[in-house]
């Protein structure tokens, strides 16, 4: 357990002076319209919202112009995968989630319809039966009295799909670590196929980074959408040759409606079991100009294996520790579904393993807090709070509340969220705090923070902790995040927490 506090660092007056100096103006004139477009679209823009989060910082102090342009790149591909909306805008979050859900459902249906027979061969017909039930294509009587049977089939199906994905990517990871001369023909072919996908992703990112106006950017996003579909599945299940029907693990699992039937029949929410299609570490490697050695690429791929294994361990935890409790609830109702069963097993939405966002009742635009909860089997959480008015960040490992999804006793280590929140608020009141802001914080201290919503974690919990610690200590990263309008700063900080940022 630990607690860390720090003052955030912004680009200060030295940067401002450098940007407006006579030398800078001469260099702007020499650079012509290309640099002008970059600078004009820089502040508050997310023009390159797919790969770059819009912060191209030009610090012109007389050195080589090419060396002086810095790029802060969010390590996700937001235009076609995920990107965090403004954490203090529930409406924006809701709209984002709805749009993502519609796009995801359309993609999943296409994958299931295209690869129907192959899915049956690989994972069995029972999982397709679950999809038919959830889509209303099978008779309701088919489910009656067999609810627990279908719940167990769905959980075992999720674990089977997850372990298959882990095994496939682990084979690639081990092949990349093997000496080239000692690789089998299958390993050589596997690496060659993945290198093609990785190089295509690398090329798409390079084009994104070079784009200097929105029209070109839109074309690059369209191009990236195809590249990402194939790059998302490192070792294909099947159908990798056709970009419009690539069968990703997430699409198959979602299309089979496994989490939905579990939630409907038991009240157990497994929406947190989600893995980033392309892990941020892989995108980070793709950003580098030089060819990436096999061993470095292997370590980036290993990061995705770690997330998948974390999700599989969580599924095993549900099967071993939670399902016996579900069966007891069903026994109370003659082993048939009853409307009281989901409510008996449901936990509070603020205790689910996600990033939960809060703000203060007063001066809400300036202060926001993220409470990050690990998967249930880990029983861990931390809090990170930001005050953009006084440029302060606070981190503390916190204990989790006991509930049924832990499947037993909870180990209490450290203080709870409420105590950490109180200390964060007290830390903000010091002599140099503006008087009005200080009074508003003191009023907020006596009230519970306002809950603004949650976001799903798609990296491992350890990676999330690492991202948070960088926001506490990395002053270079802070300077890139704390630029532009407040809304944009909050969004950039949220993306930096969920995905990480590479300052290139």
Swiss-Prot record:
It is found in: Virion. Keywords: Capsid protein, Outer capsid protein, Viral penetration into host cytoplasm, Viral penetration via permeabilization of host membrane, Virion, Virus entry into host cell. GO terms for cellular component: viral outer capsid. Residues 1-42 are annotated as: Involved in membrane permeabilization. InterPro entries: Capsid_VP5_Orbivir. The keyword Transferase does not apply. GO terms for molecular function: structural molecule activity. GO terms for biological process: symbiont entry into host cell via permeabilization of host membrane. It holds the Pfam family Orbi_VP5. The keyword Lipoprotein does not apply. Belongs to the orbivirus VP5 family. VP5 protein is one of the two proteins (with VP2) which constitute the virus particle outer capsid. Acts as a membrane permeabilization protein that mediates release of viral particles from endosomal compartments into the cytoplasm. Permeabilization activity is probably negatively regulated by VP2 and is triggered by endosomal degradation of VP2 and exposure to low pH. This is Outer capsid protein VP5. It comes from African horse sickness virus 6 (AHSV-6).
């Amino acid at each position: 357990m630990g607690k860390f506090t720090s003052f955030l660092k912004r680009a200060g007056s030295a940067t401002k002076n450098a940007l407006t100096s006579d030398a800078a103006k001469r260099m702007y004139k020499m650079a012509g319209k290309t640099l002008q477009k970059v600078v004009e679209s820089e502040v508050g823009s997310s023009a390159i919202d797919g790969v770059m989060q819009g912060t191209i910082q030009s610090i012109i102090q007389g050195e080589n112009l090419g060396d002086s342009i810095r790029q802060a790149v969010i390590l996700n591909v937001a235009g076609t995968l995920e990107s965090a909306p403004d954490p203090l805008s529930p409406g924006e979050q809701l709209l984002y989630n709805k749009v993502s859900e519609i796009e995801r459902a359309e993609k999943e249906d296409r994958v299931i319809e295209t690869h129907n027979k192959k899915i049956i061969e690989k994972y069995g017909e029972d999982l397709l039966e679950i999809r038919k039930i959830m889509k209303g294509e099978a008779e309701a009587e088919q489910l009656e009295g067999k609810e627990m049977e279908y719940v167990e089939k769905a959980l075992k199906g999720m674990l089977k799909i997850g372990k298959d994905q882990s095994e496939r990517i682990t084979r690639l990871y081990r092949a990349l670590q093997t000496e080239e001369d000692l690789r089998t023909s299958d390993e050589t072919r596997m690496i060659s196929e993945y290198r093609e996908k990785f190089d295509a992703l690398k090329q798409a990112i390079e084009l994104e980074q070079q784009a200097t106006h929105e029209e070109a950017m839109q074309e690059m996003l369209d191009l990236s959408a195809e590249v990402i579909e194939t790059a998302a599945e490192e070792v294909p299940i099947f159908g990798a040759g056709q970009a419009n029907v690539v069968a990703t693990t997430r699409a198959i699992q979602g299309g089979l409606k496994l989490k939905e039937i579990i939630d409907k029949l038991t009240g157990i929410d497994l929406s947190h079991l989600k893995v980033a299609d392309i892990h941020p570490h892989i995108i980070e490697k793709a950003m580098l100009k030089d060819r990436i050695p096999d061993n470095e690429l292997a370590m980036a791929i290993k990061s995705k294996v770690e997330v998948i294994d974390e999700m599989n361990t969580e599924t095993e935890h549900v099967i071993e520790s939670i399902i016996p409790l579900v069966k007891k609830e069903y026994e109370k109702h003659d082993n048939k579904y009853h409307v009281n069963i989901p409510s008996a097993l449901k936990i509070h939405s603020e205790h689910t393993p996600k990033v939960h966002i809060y703000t203060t009742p007063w001066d809400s635009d300036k202060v926001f807090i993220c409470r990050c909860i690990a998967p249930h089997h880990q029983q861990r959480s931390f809090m990170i709070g930001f005050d953009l008015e006084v440029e302060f960040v606070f981190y503390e490992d916190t204990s989790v509340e006991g509930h049924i999804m832990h499947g037993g006793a909870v180990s209490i280590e450290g203080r709870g969220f409420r105590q950490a929140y109180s200390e964060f608020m007290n830390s903000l009141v010091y002599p140099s705090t503006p008087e009005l802001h200080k009074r508003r914080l003191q009023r907020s201290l006596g009230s519970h923070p306002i809950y603004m919503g949650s976001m799903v974690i798609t990296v491992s919990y350890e990676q999330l902790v690492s991202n948070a610690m960088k926001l506490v200590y990395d002053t270079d990263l802070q300077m890139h995040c704390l630029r532009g309008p407040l809304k944009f700063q909050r969004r950039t900080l949220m993306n930096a927490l969920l995905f990480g940022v590479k300052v290139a």
